[in-house]
């Protein structure tokens, strides 16, 4: 279930800090920087931060922004704190379905090799979206190149 992230603010910070210097952080940031969300007590217009919870247990984090003038959702962030938990994917795709059905455009990025790629591909295909691949545009800590992938779904 998605709930306002401010309710789990400290716990989300600690979970992100546990992931510093990991491949998961590369998937979140798209670069080698370490990062954690700055969750505001009162979010700005168009900014959404959610804790993904099962029962009362924090299992993930989802964020995005909406430009209401352009009717577009973008700048998504997703982190699963409990790898393999199907509730994370279920809640995220439910929110994506809501956004796709109400907005003109939904776009998000992903680093190649992310385990969510297959699910993103299927979702994008189901909504007649596009997948753009920028070959070898990201370099990881081991020196290996990865693709930068952009998904877009545009409603008429």
Regions found by a protein language model. Give the residues of each.
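A short, well-structured alpha-helix characteristic of acyl/acetyltransferase catalytic modules
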Residues: 1-41
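Acetyl-CoA-dependent GNAT
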Residues: 28-73, 79-85
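Short hydrophobic/aromatic beta-strand or adjacent loop that forms the aromatic wall/cage
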Residues: 47, 146-150
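Residues on conserved beta-strands of the protein kinase catalytic domain
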Residues: 72-74, 147-148
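Conserved acetyl-CoA-binding loop-helix of GNAT-fold acetyltransferases
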Residues: 84-101, 117-122
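Conserved beta-strand-loop-alpha-helix junction that forms the acyl-donor binding cleft
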Residues: 107-125, 138
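Conserved catalytic-core motifs of GNAT/GCN5-like acyltransferases
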Residues: 126-146
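Short beta-strand-to-coil "C-cap" segments at the C-terminal boundary of structured domains/repeats
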Residues: 152-156
